């Protein structure tokens, strides 16, 4: 009988933010944003436990106040992956899920969808999600990361540029082509799942040329020859980068 794998969701949370300082503690209907993320992650069927990883005592205190588990991390980490690797090194888990701390509307089913490839195939070190692009604005926006993959779901590339480039239709791109599915393209959903043993490998890799060009850390994995499995999801969330994004979250929760 195969041993049941222990799967831990880790939520990296910082207080400092250039566009929205203290957003992890932003009030959403009486609870801090980090609590919303924590509670939704805990509802994922495949997740055994949830941990908030932070270097800020204000966030740690808020997590403890609602009964959550918190791990304090070094304040010198340059990336969320480094913070994740520090926590992974001292907890008992087989699979680590990196749940973004600014996704208060994340659906627990999305987390389960991203985990399953690692349960089905022991050779996969890392997995993530994608969803269909349905507007021309998203397709053209450098703030929306596009992704292409092979027929078996292995990522080929992530980019801030339009991807793929529809050469024959470029001068006649319209929203309805994306809505109808005539033009199929996907945006990356920033939820990552790792085998625990892969995290220190990833964190130990040097930044790569394409990673630095696109400012996309996950390209470091591809440039070093590792596979990333990607799964399409029907669910969409709202990342909170600004106070205006927070207003959108509140509107959806109230509506």
Curated annotation (Swiss-Prot):
Keywords assigned by UniProt, alphabetized: Cytoplasm, Lipopolysaccharide biosynthesis, Nucleotidyltransferase, Transferase
Subcellular location: Cytoplasm
Pathway(s) annotated for this protein in UniProt: Nucleotide-sugar biosynthesis; CMP-3-deoxy-D-manno-octulosonate biosynthesis; CMP-3-deoxy-D-manno-octulosonate from 3-deoxy-D-manno-octulosonate and CTP: step 1/1; Bacterial outer membrane biogenesis; lipopolysaccharide biosynthesis
Single GO biological process annotation from the record: lipopolysaccharide biosynthetic process
GO molecular function ontology, one term from the record: 3-deoxy-manno-octulosonate cytidylyltransferase activity
Major localization listed first in the record, in broad terms: cytoplasm
Domain of life: Bacteria
Catalytic activity: 3-deoxy-alpha-D-manno-oct-2-ulosonate + CTP = CMP-3-deoxy-beta-D-manno-octulosonate + diphosphate
The enzyme's E.C. designation: 2.7.7.38
Cross-referenced InterPro entries: Cytidylyl_trans, KdsB, Nucleotide-diphossugar_trans
Record-linked Pfam families: CTP_transf_3
Any one annotated GO CC term: cytosol
Function: Activates KDO (a required 8-carbon sugar) for incorporation into bacterial lipopolysaccharide in Gram-negative bacteria.
Protein family membership: Belongs to the KdsB family.
Family annotation (HAMAP family): KdsB
Protein name, per record: 3-deoxy-manno-octulosonate cytidylyltransferase
Gene name in the database record: kdsB
């Amino acid at each position: 009988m195969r041993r049941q794998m222990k799967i831990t969701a880790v939520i990296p949370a910082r207080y400092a933010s250039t566009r929205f300082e203290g957003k992890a503690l932003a009030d959403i209907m009486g609870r801090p944003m980090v609590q919303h993320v924590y509670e939704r992650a805990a509802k994922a069927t495949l997740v055994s436990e949830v941990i908030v990883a932070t270097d800020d005592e204000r966030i740690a205190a808020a997590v403890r106040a609602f009964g959550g588990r918190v791990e304090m991390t070094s304040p010198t980490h340059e990336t969320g992956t480094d913070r994740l690797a520090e926590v992974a090194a001292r907890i008992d888990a087989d699979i680590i899920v990196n749940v973004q701390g600014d996704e208060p509307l994340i659906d627990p089913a999305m987390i389960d969808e991203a985990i399953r490839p690692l349960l089905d195939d022991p050779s996969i070190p890392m997995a993530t999600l994608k969803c269909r692009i349905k507007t021309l604005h998203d397709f053209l926006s450098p703030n929306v990361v596009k992704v292409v993959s092979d027929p078996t779901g292995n990522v080929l590339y992530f980019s801030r540029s339009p991807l793929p480039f529809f050469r024959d239709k470029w001068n006649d791109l319209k929203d309805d082509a994306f809505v109808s599915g005539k033009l199929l393209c996907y945006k990356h959903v920033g939820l990552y799942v790792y085998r625990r043993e892969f995290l220190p490998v990833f964190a130990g890799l040097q930044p790569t040329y394409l990673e630095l060009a696109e400012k996309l850390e996950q390209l470091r994995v591809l440039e070093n020859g590792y596979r990333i499995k990607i799964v399409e999801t029907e669910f969409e969330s709202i990342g909170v980068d600004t106070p205006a994004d927070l207003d959108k979250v509140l509107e959806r929760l109230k509506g």
